[in-house]
């Protein structure tokens, strides 16, 4: 870990806190997610690492490596300087249809790539959609903690995700197609970009999760009169927000929809852009590191001594000056099975 120095805190998420770091040799910036060793290294963490490392696409945050400190597991990944798409919408209120399409095209490109590798995300939302720092921002999907691989796992049947984005079939305890559920979540993202509000929240009581779930189950939504949305876009949304997953539009059909194809960037016709190769760490190395991280730790404080840096005070990861904030719980990410009382 000695090769990285900490620049600043950049937030907290489902499993830990994140820091912006700089590679001392290349000067490249990376984001590092720190997860406390021991019980917090659960199946979600392992799934996130193993699925994320296999994904190499311009619209997905690039996984670099996983490392151990004395007290934490550290996930090193690409840094998205543009922040969350959520923040951009909060600042703008809502996007024009052209701007919403620009971001939606990239989102679908990244999700389609995941699905081509039999990986469904299962927690797609604006907060998990980052932007790079370029003038025409590139979408970067992140946070694969809830993702499920069709190669490694059976069809998902657990109720996970964020209530506002969750598909009707996910609310049941039966198996469902995670890819089709991802389509629904992409539709919610598109709607929020266009309208500046969630499609299934009751405008008079947006915090009532039971009302939200009731509207989701009925696919009950409306586009406000004050928002100008083309008929083509309305048609696409109506094909996404279909309660029966068997009748819902697929990613492939979205890619061929007339609204989606308008102003489609050339590189999306030609396939993925050239990207850096996969992590240099082997699967065996990563599995060993994860298993080590699961073992109870005996170190009493901080990140001191990680990577053998001992008591250095230069701000490098693992130095004794390192101070991690307490992990925050993301209360938006809840098991909605707890909400399923009679409507």
Curated annotation (Swiss-Prot):
Q: Which residues form the active site?
A: 123 (proton acceptor)
The reaction(s) catalysed by this protein are: L-seryl-[protein] + ATP = O-phospho-L-seryl-[protein] + ADP + H(+); L-threonyl-[protein] + ATP = O-phospho-L-threonyl-[protein] + ADP + H(+)
Question: What SMART domains does its record include?
Answer: S_TKc
Source organism, top-level taxon = Eukaryota
Q: Which GO terms describe its cellular component?
A: cytoplasm; nucleus
Residue positions binding ATP: 10-18, 33
Enumerate the UniProt keywords alphabetically: ATP-binding, Kinase, Nucleotide-binding, Phosphoprotein, Serine/threonine-protein kinase, Transferase
Q: Which InterPro entries match?
A: Kinase-like_dom_sf, Prot_kinase_dom, Protein_kinase_ATP_BS, Ser/Thr_kinase_AS
| Molecular function GO labels | ATP binding; protein serine kinase activity; protein serine/threonine kinase activity
Sequence ranges assigned to domain Protein kinase in this UniProt record:
4-260
Q: What induces it?
A: By abscisic acid (ABA), cold, H(2)O(2), salt, and osmotic stress (at protein level).
Please, one GO biological process term?
A: response to osmotic stress
Query: Which residues carry the post-translational modification Phosphothreonine, per the record?
Result: 158
- Give the tissue specificity: Expressed in seedlings.
Entry EC no(s)? 2.7.11.1
Pfam families (UniProt xref): Pkinase (PF00069)
* Family named by the database record: Belongs to the protein kinase superfamily. Ser/Thr protein kinase family.
Described by its record, this protein's role is as follows: Involved in gene regulation and confers tolerance to drought and osmotic stress.
Name this protein carries in UniProt: Serine/threonine-protein kinase SRK2C
Organism, by scientific name, is: Arabidopsis thaliana
Q: What is the lineage of its organism?
A: Eukaryota, Viridiplantae, Streptophyta, Embryophyta, Tracheophyta
- Gene that encodes the chain: SRK2C
